[in-house]
Amino acid sequence: MTELKPLLIELGTEELPVNALPNLSRAFFEGVLAGLEKRGIVVDHGEAKSLSTPRRLAVLLTAVAVEQPKQYRELFGPYLNTAFDTEGKPTKALEGFAAKCGVNWRTLERIRDTKGERFVHRVVVPGERTDALLPGILTEAIAGMPIPKPMRWGAHEYLFARPVHWLVMLLGQDVVEAEIMGVKAGRISRGHRFLYDKPVSLSDPQNYIDVLQAAYVLVDPAARRARIVAEIEAVARQVGGVARITEDNVAQVVNLVEWPSAVLCSFERVFLEVPQEALIQTMEVNQKFFPVLDSLGKLTEKFIGIANIESNDVAEVAKGYERVIRPRFSDAKFFFNEDLKQGLKAMGERLRTVTYHAKLGTLADKVARVLVLAEAIAPQIGVDPLLARRVALLSKNDLQSRMVNEFPELQGIAGHHYALISGELPEVAMAIEDAYRPRFSGDEIARSPLGKVLGLAERLDTLACGFAVGMKPTGNKDPFGLRRNALGLARTMIESRFDLDLKVLLDQASDWVAFATTIEQERHAQESVKQSKKEAAVKHSVPQVSDEKSARIEELYDFIVERLRGYYADKGIPTTHFNAVAELKPVSLYDFHRRLDAIGRFAALPEAEALAVANKRIRNILRKAEIKIPASVDATLFDQPAESGLLVALEGVITDTRSALDCKNYVSVLTCLARLRPPIDEFFDKVMVNDENLMLRANRLALLQRLGEYLCCVAAIEHLSN
């Protein structure tokens, strides 16, 4: 039995980049494991730990074999027909092989393969010791790390994210001799930079976490996270509030500290006059602080900072944090007051001076297009078109505010506040902010009907614009954010149960974009031909229908639907089900969703697989047909009971499901289709479709064509076939 020992590798550095630390730690851990496994060294993965702090990367394995297993090798020699001469004496080939193996040829074994019998020498090579292999393993692991900006440090030749100051390598209680990046391995680590700034001697890997904790270092990120969250919640409770704790903020702070300690801070209440989103943005994104809210979710004047020390003078630490935040809050208040002086209307007037795209005009032009689309969508979902017009008219005004210029993440949010202050209806103000939802992956869609209308109109215009000017996404490039806009559009339609004709909306959006590009061309032409804008508008007021436009609408539709593939995959919907519905190209995405739901239920029926196979067979037969197929079935040409039986069953199902299909009750339709399995099976068992009699053949093909069309009335069910 191979002896197992714990292994510790710790690489000590200057403070590593906070955003890169998780990936560096993961890659370091995986690289060490991969190196051990590559060399056949046994590792117990049960208690394996990837550990890190801003100043160190560590791998802790509880059980690693002290040596490789024995290596069994086979060296293949010559075949018998070349190993001996005609007199049966060994040839130079055999003697040379034996000499290479260091044995007498008579001791060699023989094996037989497809070419005949040959000599083989089997040897057992002792495994190398793990401590001898570890330097190479560590070097490989470091070389494979995703270092964002590798640099040389001092007089050293190595490239790394930060200077390396120490290296601990212990296999059991023994130091592994190695020199990596100019540092010799040992058993000396370092404690906290301020609370325990002295060497820490490690005698055994199994004591690593506890010894460092005694030196004021929580080396396990999970332990630091737990302490941070617990302390923040406790401090917030002390002042009767609730801390706003986001995963992104916690993840950042975890990688900034080795010994976290929560500190309660405060700011002047006058800053609460500023929209709270701006203050929260400043605290979380710029300073990594945690705002404290009241029971209603409103921001209070309290916030919590996480210090990397346990201070004897917490009040002084708090003053430092407050001193840092005050200038930023003062700036936010200044921007807010300046915006109030100019007002929302003045901001909107400046949209004419901002180019949206060289071929698409200004932001004011975009607002005009969105306004028309919003007016068209609103009555279809029960929203007042006048309100839709108003919210569209105001939707981009805040882009010209000082607040959004300083805090781009507040677009829409700032507009909401300024609209309320300007006396707009609450639903109009809310819709300005709401329309931006979903802002990120996993975010909720817009909550208000008016916000949904604006969000749909905005995204339709953006998608049509992007495709019209050739800004389609390629690889990881998506300058217009078309993928995100497409998914936001689709999610809003589906999750709001809006049964809207997507192709009609895309057609309308494309018309207005075509009009915009034409006007822009005329604007440029005015410089040379002095043609008036009014003449250009009259000349081009009716967009021309073209094959190119139709193709673009189809391309846009396919692009949007393709974004749904991942959306449904995340919900566990099989790709085969998605493909079955996508082939029919339903014009309504909510209708797409209902068909997909029905297919999921249909697939669970025992008849589903057989009908899917039958439909695939029908398609193959029709595709290979070499004669013209009649438009209708002639029952007088039937000469087999199975033919008439199938037609009667099909007509019965069509009659029974007509109402359900009109009401889009797809589950009921597909359940009825299951009744067709017996007559379909009998038809294929008893009837020769490609009969020599061409009239019979054509009539049977017509029957199959009608059957195939109805089997696919909800989805192309052949995709369900295994």
From Swiss-Prot:
PROSITE patterns: AA_TRNA_LIGASE_II_GLYAB (PS50861). The keyword Manganese does not apply. Belongs to the class-II aminoacyl-tRNA synthetase family. Keywords: Aminoacyl-tRNA synthetase, ATP-binding, Cytoplasm, Ligase, Nucleotide-binding, Protein biosynthesis. It is found in: Cytoplasm. GO terms for biological process: arginyl-tRNA aminoacylation; glycyl-tRNA aminoacylation. Tetramer of two alpha and two beta subunits. Signal peptide: none annotated. One of its GO terms (molecular function) is arginine-tRNA ligase activity. It catalyses: tRNA(Gly) + glycine + ATP = glycyl-tRNA(Gly) + AMP + diphosphate. Its EC number is 6.1.1.14. HAMAP family: Gly_tRNA_synth_beta. It holds the Pfam family DALR_1. GO terms for cellular component: cytosol. This is Glycine--tRNA ligase beta subunit. The lineage of its organism: Bacteria, Pseudomonadati, Pseudomonadota, Gammaproteobacteria, Lysobacterales.
